[in-house]
Amino acid sequence: MMSSLVRHLARVASIAGLATALTLVAASVAIAQKGGNIRGTVTNAQTHAPILGARVAIANPERVAITDDHGTYVLRELPAGTYVVMTSAIGRKPDSSSVSVSAGSTVTRDVVMKEGSLLLSSVIVSATRSPVEASKVASTVNVLTPEQVRQSPARESQDLLREISAVELPRTSSLVGGTAQIVSIRGVDEGRTAVLFDGIPVNDAWGEWIDWGRIPKVMLDRVEVVEGGTSSLYGNGAMGGAISFFSRPLSPGAMTMTLDGGSRDARHGAISAGVPIYGALSANVVGDYQQGGGYNLIDPAKAGAVDVVSQVIQRNAYLRLNYAPSANWSAFVTGHEFGDSRNTGTPLSFANRDQQNFDLGLNYGAYTTGFLSLRAFDGRQTEAQRSTAIRAGGRAAEDSSLTATIPSHDWGGSAQWTRSNTWMLESFSVGGDFRHYQGDFNEVDFNTTCPGVNCGKLARTVSSGGSQNLSGAFIQAIAAPIAPLRIELSARVDRWDNNNGHSLDVTPTATSNVTNTKSYGDSSKTAFSPRVGLRYQLFSSLSLHAAYYRAFRAPNLAELYRKQVSSTSITIPNPYLAAENAEGREAGFDWQPIDWIQFKGTWYVADYNNFNVPTNLTATSTPPRPADCGTVTTCRTRLNVNKSRSEGGEAYVAVHPIQQLFLSGSVNYDDDRQQSGLPAGTTDNTKPHINRVPSPKQTLRGTYSSAMFGDWTALYRHEGHTTTLQGVWLDPFTVVDANVQREIVPGVRGFVSVENIGDKKYQINLSAAGPAGIASIGMPRTVRVGVEAYRY
């Protein structure tokens, strides 16, 4: 196996050639740059020992440094000016101070950090859309710090989220299965959580699906998760909360290169470099490539000749140009190319995605005098897929049932102005954004009566699509009228317009084609999303927080306009769908009775209304069956008819008994049940659960770090009972993952990651209940071995 691994790593290394050359150029050119530097050491106030893994950052231009084993850091190539330097570390109180830098100089800024929060030690931006200590916000927030991201056994950005118990993901890894990937928070159901990468939406334009592969782990600085409805700041889709990924800012001259491989022919290579160009102009270059590591999804007890290994190839190429002439303003332009090619478990089935994203931004000013942030983005995606029907009799053969192409395009922008300590407020923000979506679903259906004379013949073609414009504006005021009390008030108004709905389906007959063309009317809707949050510091060790919010989600293009036709059924578009909405309440506490242990917990309840779901139409239904349904037996459309309630709680604990050891754990219980369409006599205990919401969930994480032995991390995950999308119950499961990494020589570390150490066999899907059901299984034991070279 070792010789095979070396061979694969050598093959993957070829993708790094150009970026390596750029890195060498960066190292040589950096010497001639005229910018200033900030360097220093971060130490423990009690023991005076250096702190490893502290995050030292400035906001404009964006720079981040992580302290090494000696607690040292360097922020390189800064334009002359005054900066607010923020330092954070787990178990330490965040530090913020101003530092002035002149051209060509190096300023020393040593930081002595006092003991602080174990669970809320970071400075975050997603909870209020401006920097604030996590321990001050009136929300339930969870942060994966740069060190936690680096030490995680997870291979994918999606899998990083699995250790946050309130985040619900499909059991299927994003490395296998289809491209339509989703996420949920607190049982709000799929597709109703905002996901952002550097402040720009990741949810795609057609179905709000997420390509986790376009956020490779090697690019990440940190992850912030805000739980509960956040539409008052983020607008559409943030019914369950917001997940924000932040890329690692690369200083000119910085670089990382990673090569790894492992189980089932897995190969991965990545490189990133900060390249000085001229004066205040620099570039960030990132390349990431991976393939292999897949497996046969079908339980071997039921697998047949048609079942093969599900595989994926993912490619990322990223370029960012940065211009930072002063400490008061900076600008950037980015281009990002992403490709995902996969088979989905049989020889004929596949799903491919290609994306091109272009972003630009401008930051001006400072939070103390007024900080303006402008963003614009443009994204294009083309997806191609083929689905198959498995013939009866032992899964021995398959036939193409559908091929589809799904082109989509979205573009938009945002503006935000924030000022701190003004008008008797701690912070005041106003902003707005706009996003345009357009897309089509073009499918070709084939006859699957096989074997037979019509097997494989064209059954019909269906093309449907439309466009949507969505805009909103928000305002936020944060006040601390008395020292222990902090009040967060925010509100937002959104409007969306559904336009250009259309469909065309063509069914061939023996003599001609039957064509049905339809145009759909335009519609407009609005939503109002307020939020009130309170945090009260009852004692120095105990704080309480509570919040009330309303949130919404506009229907996406797939829900509005996708038309589906078969010989026995039809699903017709509904361009007049209303918004889904949520009304939620939560209350929680943060308690740190002694310096080395902390607890936090939250109770929440949220009512979700107007969920749109496919609904059968009949002559007596409301609305009644229209003429568009034709003569088929079953006619459906999406209607806003479902209601649900999510009620539950979560608890977190962190223990930091010695500097080298950090332990944390969490548990989430979510009772999420349907509230509408129930038969008479249904009680609270017999109301059906919302599908694909596991409960309970538990995680335990332990990390031991030392200069001699390196970093050792173990992660325990348990998911309780859940259901498939079709409502079939899945058994609970438990897995343990681990990661070990150690510096080999200065600037080079080796690592070994193992997912599912016990090779636990667990269900990720089940076609039907009982013995006839065919189970898909989760990822078996997966070992990866690699090396990373770095210069921060």
Question: How should each PLM-predicted stretch be described?
Answer:
Residues 28-123, 163, 168, 186:
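Periplasm-facing N-terminal accessory domains of Gram-negative outer-membrane beta-barrel systems
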Residues 339, 380-384, 438-440, 445, ...:
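Surface-exposed extracellular loop regions of Gram-negative outer-membrane beta-barrel proteins
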Residues 552, 609, 614, 741-792:
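C-terminal beta-signal and adjacent terminal beta-strands/loops
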Residues 158, 162-201, 221:
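Extracytoplasmic beta-strand/coil segments of soluble accessory domains associated
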Residues 310, 318, 408-417, 462, ...:
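Outer membrane beta-barrel strand-and-loop segments of large Gram-negative receptors
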Residues 183, 200-227:
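Short acidic/polar hinge/loop motifs at secondary-structure boundaries
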Residues 263-291, 301-341, 350-371, 422-426, ...:
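Transmembrane beta-barrel wall of Gram-negative outer-membrane proteins
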Residues 480-487, 495, 599-608, 628-724:
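Gram-negative outer-membrane beta-barrel transporters
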